[in-house]
């Protein structure tokens, strides 16, 4: 029994189109520009500005069989090289240091999440979330 060429080509197309690796394209872990906010107790305004953060997809594997003796961990997109910058919050009360220092991503990598430097929660607040009145820096 021979398979017509058109059926063979259709079969090849369908096999490739449903490949997990090719069914969608996700951006790889890399620095991206993002609007973020900083605020501090004693300062009535939240400062909103753009900076480079790490964002993107990291390949991960999850075992089919999960044993209580096996370690399961996932890699996340996080900072490799950073530079620190400082901004000054407006209208802070006397005695409150108005300066806030934040990391700027220079390069990123897929690695285990470090709670000391990263937000490792499943879903966190948006990066530009503010509890107080927002003030924008327009000259990024």
From Swiss-Prot:
Residues 1-23 form the signal peptide. GO terms for molecular function: follicle-stimulating hormone receptor binding; hormone activity; lutropin-choriogonadotropic hormone receptor binding; protein heterodimerization activity. The keyword Signal applies. Disulfide bonds join 29-77, 43-92, 46-130, 54-108, 58-110, 113-120. One of its GO terms (cellular component) is cytoplasm. Glycans are attached at residue 33. PROSITE patterns: GLYCO_HORMONE_BETA_1, GLYCO_HORMONE_BETA_2. Keywords: Disulfide bond, Glycoprotein, Hormone, Secreted, Signal. Pfam families: Cys_knot (PF00007). It is found in: Secreted. GO terms for biological process: G protein-coupled receptor signaling pathway; positive regulation of androgen secretion; positive regulation of estradiol secretion; positive regulation of gene expression. Belongs to the glycoprotein hormones subunit beta family. Involved in gametogenesis and steroidogenesis. Heterodimer of an alpha and a beta chain. This is Gonadotropin subunit beta-2. It comes from Ictalurus punctatus (Channel catfish).
């Amino acid at each position: 029994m021979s398979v017509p060429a058109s059926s063979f080509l259709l079969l090849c197309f369908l096999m490739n189109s449903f490949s997990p690796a090719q069914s969608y394209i996700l951006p790889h872990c890399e620095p991206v520009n993002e609007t973020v906010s900083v605020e501090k107790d004693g300062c009535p305004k939240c400062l909103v500005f753009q900076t480079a953060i790490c964002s993107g997809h990291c390949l991960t594997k999850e075992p089919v069989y999960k044993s209580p003796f096996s370690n399961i961990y996932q890699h996340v997109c996080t900072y490799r090289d950073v530079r620190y910058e400082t901004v000054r919050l407006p209208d802070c009360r006397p005695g409150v240091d108005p300066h806030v220092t934040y990391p700027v991503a220079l390069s990123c990598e897929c690695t285990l999440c470090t709670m000391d430097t990263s937000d490792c929660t499943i879903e966190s607040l948006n990066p530009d979330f503010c509890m107080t009145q927002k003030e924008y820096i327009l000259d990024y």
